[in-house]
Protein backbone atom coordinates (compact mmCIF):
# COMPACT_ATOMS: atom_id res chain seq x y z
CA UNK A 1 0.00 0.00 0.00
CA UNK A 2 1.12 3.56 -0.69
CA UNK A 3 2.37 5.79 2.13
CA UNK A 4 5.07 8.47 2.47
CA UNK A 5 8.54 7.30 3.46
CA UNK A 6 8.85 10.18 5.90
CA UNK A 7 6.95 13.38 6.67
CA UNK A 8 7.80 16.64 8.37
CA UNK A 9 5.02 16.16 10.93
CA UNK A 10 3.36 12.94 12.16
CA UNK A 11 -0.16 14.34 12.48
CA UNK A 12 -2.25 16.72 10.35
CA UNK A 13 -5.45 18.65 10.75
CA UNK A 14 -8.41 17.46 8.71
CA UNK A 15 -8.82 20.55 6.53
CA UNK A 16 -11.61 21.27 4.06
CA UNK A 17 -12.26 20.29 0.45
CA UNK A 18 -13.66 23.33 -1.28
CA UNK A 19 -13.84 23.94 -5.02
CA UNK A 20 -12.53 21.91 -7.92
CA UNK A 21 -9.08 20.48 -8.57
CA UNK A 22 -6.93 23.14 -10.23
CA UNK A 23 -3.93 20.85 -10.69
CA UNK A 24 -3.83 17.26 -11.85
CA UNK A 25 -7.01 17.72 -13.89
CA UNK A 26 -5.53 17.07 -17.34
CA UNK A 27 -4.40 13.77 -18.89
CA UNK A 28 -0.59 13.76 -18.83
CA UNK A 29 0.69 10.25 -19.50
CA UNK A 30 -1.83 7.79 -20.93
CA UNK A 31 -4.60 7.84 -23.50
CA UNK A 32 -7.52 7.22 -21.12
CA UNK A 33 -8.21 8.39 -17.57
CA UNK A 34 -10.55 8.08 -14.60
CA UNK A 35 -11.66 11.48 -13.31
CA UNK A 36 -13.23 12.19 -9.92
CA UNK A 37 -16.60 13.96 -9.91
CA UNK A 38 -16.98 14.35 -6.13
CA UNK A 39 -14.72 15.49 -3.28
CA UNK A 40 -13.49 12.77 -0.94
CA UNK A 41 -10.60 11.20 0.91
CA UNK A 42 -9.32 8.14 -0.96
CA UNK A 43 -7.44 5.70 1.28
CA UNK A 44 -4.29 3.86 0.23
CA UNK A 45 -6.27 0.58 0.43
CA UNK A 46 -8.87 1.89 -2.03
CA UNK A 47 -6.15 3.05 -4.44
CA UNK A 48 -4.49 -0.38 -4.22
CA UNK A 49 -7.80 -2.23 -4.73
CA UNK A 50 -8.58 -0.13 -7.82
CA UNK A 51 -5.07 -0.69 -9.18
CA UNK A 52 -5.39 -4.45 -8.72
CA UNK A 53 -8.80 -4.54 -10.41
CA UNK A 54 -7.40 -2.69 -13.44
CA UNK A 55 -4.21 -4.78 -13.58
CA UNK A 56 -6.15 -8.04 -13.44
CA UNK A 57 -8.43 -6.97 -16.27
CA UNK A 58 -5.81 -5.62 -18.70
CA UNK A 59 -3.42 -8.51 -17.85
CA UNK A 60 -0.04 -7.98 -19.54
CA UNK A 61 -1.00 -5.28 -22.03
CA UNK A 62 -1.02 -1.57 -21.33
CA UNK A 63 0.45 0.66 -18.64
CA UNK A 64 -1.24 2.18 -15.58
CA UNK A 65 -0.32 5.50 -14.00
CA UNK A 66 -1.59 6.31 -10.50
CA UNK A 67 -1.95 10.09 -10.31
CA UNK A 68 -2.97 10.41 -6.64
CA UNK A 69 -0.76 9.71 -3.63
CA UNK A 70 -1.97 9.27 -0.03
CA UNK A 71 0.12 11.84 1.85
CA UNK A 72 -2.35 12.83 4.59
CA UNK A 73 -2.31 10.84 7.86
CA UNK A 74 -5.66 10.07 9.50
CA UNK A 75 -5.44 9.56 13.25
CA UNK A 76 -7.67 7.34 15.37
CA UNK A 77 -8.02 6.81 19.08
CA UNK A 78 -8.21 3.35 20.60
CA UNK A 79 -11.73 1.95 21.04
CA UNK A 80 -13.55 2.87 24.28
CA UNK A 81 -11.04 5.56 25.21
CA UNK A 82 -12.14 8.51 27.33
CA UNK A 83 -12.03 12.02 25.90
CA UNK A 84 -8.89 14.07 26.32
CA UNK A 85 -5.25 12.96 26.60
CA UNK A 86 -4.27 14.22 23.15
CA UNK A 87 -4.79 13.27 19.55
CA UNK A 88 -4.77 9.62 18.47
CA UNK A 89 -2.00 7.83 16.61
CA UNK A 90 -1.85 7.89 12.78
CA UNK A 91 -3.87 4.91 11.58
CA UNK A 92 -3.90 5.10 7.77
CA UNK A 93 -3.11 7.44 4.88
CA UNK A 94 -5.48 9.23 2.50
CA UNK A 95 -5.23 11.27 -0.70
CA UNK A 96 -7.40 14.39 -0.79
CA UNK A 97 -9.32 14.24 -4.09
CA UNK A 98 -11.37 17.16 -5.38
CA UNK A 99 -13.80 17.12 -8.32
CA UNK A 100 -11.96 17.12 -11.65
CA UNK A 101 -8.87 15.33 -10.37
CA UNK A 102 -7.40 12.63 -12.64
CA UNK A 103 -6.86 9.57 -10.44
CA UNK A 104 -5.72 6.87 -12.86
CA UNK A 105 -4.40 6.89 -16.42
CA UNK A 106 -4.13 4.01 -18.84
CA UNK A 107 -2.30 3.60 -22.14
CA UNK A 108 -1.37 0.95 -24.66
CA UNK A 109 -4.78 -0.76 -24.81
CA UNK A 110 -7.89 -0.38 -26.97
CA UNK A 111 -10.70 1.84 -25.69
CA UNK A 112 -13.15 -0.98 -24.86
CA UNK A 113 -10.62 -2.68 -22.57
CA UNK A 114 -9.64 0.64 -20.98
CA UNK A 115 -13.29 1.57 -20.40
CA UNK A 116 -14.06 -1.76 -18.70
CA UNK A 117 -10.86 -1.66 -16.60
CA UNK A 118 -11.72 1.85 -15.38
CA UNK A 119 -15.30 0.74 -14.66
CA UNK A 120 -14.02 -2.10 -12.47
CA UNK A 121 -11.64 0.31 -10.70
CA UNK A 122 -14.46 2.81 -10.09
CA UNK A 123 -16.39 0.18 -8.10
CA UNK A 124 -13.52 0.12 -5.60
CA UNK A 125 -13.71 3.88 -5.01
CA UNK A 126 -16.17 5.72 -2.72
CA UNK A 127 -16.93 8.48 -5.24
CA UNK A 128 -18.58 9.01 -8.61
CA UNK A 129 -16.10 9.03 -11.47
CA UNK A 130 -16.09 9.34 -15.24
CA UNK A 131 -14.02 7.85 -18.04
CA UNK A 132 -12.30 10.39 -20.26
CA UNK A 133 -10.23 10.12 -23.44
CA UNK A 134 -7.32 12.41 -24.29
CA UNK A 135 -8.18 14.95 -26.99
CA UNK A 136 -5.88 14.79 -29.98
CA UNK A 137 -4.14 18.12 -30.59
Swiss-Prot record:
Which UniProt keywords are listed? Ribonucleoprotein, Ribosomal protein, RNA-binding, rRNA-binding, tRNA-binding
Signal peptide range in chain numbering: none
Q: Which GO cellular component does the record give, naming just one?
A: cytosolic large ribosomal subunit
Q: What's one GO BP annotation on this UniProt entry?
A: translation
Q: Which InterPro entries match?
A: Ribosomal_uL16 (IPR047873), Ribosomal_uL16_bact-type (IPR000114), Ribosomal_uL16_CS (IPR020798), Ribosomal_uL16_dom (IPR016180), Ribosomal_uL16_sf (IPR036920)
Instruction: Region Disordered: list its residue ranges.
Output: 1-24
Q: Where along the chain is composition biased (Basic residues)?
A: 1-17
User: Which proteins does it associate with, and in what oligomeric form?
Assistant: Part of the 50S ribosomal subunit.
Function recorded in the entry: Binds 23S rRNA and is also seen to make contacts with the A and possibly P site tRNAs.
* Record family assignment: Belongs to the universal ribosomal protein uL16 family.
Return the protein name: Large ribosomal subunit protein uL16
Gene for this chain: rplP
Amino acid sequence: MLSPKRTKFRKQQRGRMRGNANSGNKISFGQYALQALEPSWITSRQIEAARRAMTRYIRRGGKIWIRVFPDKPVTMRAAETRMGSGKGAPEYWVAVVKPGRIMFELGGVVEEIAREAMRLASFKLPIKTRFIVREED
